[in-house]
């Protein structure tokens, strides 16, 4: 029943690992320095029913496949080498109650790749050819009842 914003580009030449937690009343907390390599244009999704993952994106060296798991208390873990095609600017969502999916993005060219995330945050290998290749899209979960 809470949320988090993390990472991003606060200026044109820098990448941050800042995070802002959001309470179950919708109040956004002030900046706190996060963990992991600062990057932008990353993908994120929920998994495990109450946890999240931040993955892929762009840092000062280019696109990356790094992932950071977030606990159900809002703690973001250290960088873990990712799996799948290095890309940025895709998106992700929760599905099936306790799993996630991240998809699409850009490797320099738009791609139609998806990666499933199991209920413990493991990102599966690429599945290709999933709809029209694109980047900069939105994603949401639907069909859940409160």
Regions found by a protein language model. Name each.
Residues 1-146:
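Polar, enzyme-active/binding microenvironments
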